[in-house]
Amino acid sequence: MARKKKQDKGQGPKTIAQNRRARHDYHIEDTYEAGLVLTGTEVKSLRAGRASLVDGFAQIKNGEVWLHNVHIPEYTMGTWTNHAPRRPRKLLLHREEIAKLDAKTREAGRTLVPLSLYFRNGRAKVEIALARGKREYDKRHDIAEREAKREMERALRRRR
């Protein structure tokens, strides 16, 4: 009898939510992939593609990393077992990574922000970044660079 093939849960990561605002408001210094400790209704809500990372941030307390202000709406088919949409969620990282992040976030002006939320091999993951806040003139400078690049590309297209 032939063996059954193991069902593939998807080739690459299935992105649920991205925090575009973080890349605009912060200088991203380093990124880390962390697992999430979730309840059943949170996973079902994420599988439906519903989440918002806009106001999210991560904090280190007692050697554990916690994700705050990430909105995962209640599962529509859930009953009294539904979760609180903005509850703090524990992130799973290696001890060495937590120690390194703790040392770096103690420096002035550094924070941990979520960049994206996705499923990898059936497990919910969040990409967090060690970031430093941008000032208003930094944001304007980035916008000016982007506009100059667009103008250059337009000019090249017209020449062809």
Swiss-Prot record:
Pfam families membership: SmpB
InterPro entries for this protein: SmpB, SsrA-bd_prot, SsrA-bd_prot_CS
PROSITE patterns associated with the record: SSRP (PS01317)
GO molecular function terms attached to this record: RNA binding
Keywords from the named record: Cytoplasm, RNA-binding
Keyword check for Cytoplasm: yes
One of the record's GO cellular component terms: cytosol
UniProt-listed GO biological process terms: trans-translation
Disordered: annotated span: 1-23
Keyword Membrane among UniProt keywords: no
Subcellular location(s) per record: Cytoplasm
Function: Required for rescue of stalled ribosomes mediated by trans-translation. Binds to transfer-messenger RNA (tmRNA), required for stable association of tmRNA with ribosomes. tmRNA and SmpB together mimic tRNA shape, replacing the anticodon stem-loop with SmpB. tmRNA is encoded by the ssrA gene; the 2 termini fold to resemble tRNA(Ala) and it encodes a 'tag peptide', a short internal open reading frame. During trans-translation Ala-aminoacylated tmRNA acts like a tRNA, entering the A-site of stalled ribosomes, displacing the stalled mRNA.
Protein family according to the UniProt entry: Belongs to the SmpB family.
Descriptive protein name: SsrA-binding protein
